[in-house]
Amino acid sequence: MARTKQTARKSTGGKAPRKQLATKAARKSAPATGGVKKPHRFRPGTVALREIRKYQKSTELLIRKLPFQRLVREIAQDFKTDLRFQSSAVAALQEAAEAYLVGLFEDTNLCAIHAKRVTIMPKDIQLARRIRGERA
């Protein structure tokens, strides 16, 4: 076999051998010397799924009562001043409003999934309302 000339090749810079003992010792002694422990973080989506299960199980109202009552009174002022509301009337309005919003968000989520996305966007809400016939 004929001999060929060897050309000098540049090193690819492989990983340098690490000193195992020094790093292990430092890792073990860090908490003892007052090292700050990192707070536990769940993987992205885990907490969201837990919240979905929690709120699907529950029946309590999700909008705070007093801010909703102020909003109702503010809107009613445009039609007639000095209106009075029974507490049961405000509760019924809130129940209906939350039921409407939950249904709208369910339809909005379906629109986002149909578009091969997991994030809902304003255009999904607009499409859901358009399909329902609420907005031309």
From Swiss-Prot:
Phosphothreonine carried by residues: 12
Record SMART domains: H3
N6,N6-dimethyllysine modified-residue sites: 5, 10, 28, 37
Site positions per UniProt: Recognition by ATXR5 and ATXR6: 32
Site (Required for interaction with TSK): 32
N6-methyllysine PTM positions: 5, 10, 19, 24, 28, 37
Name under which the protein is recorded: Histone H3.1
Upper taxonomic lineage: Eukaryota, Viridiplantae, Streptophyta, Embryophyta, Tracheophyta
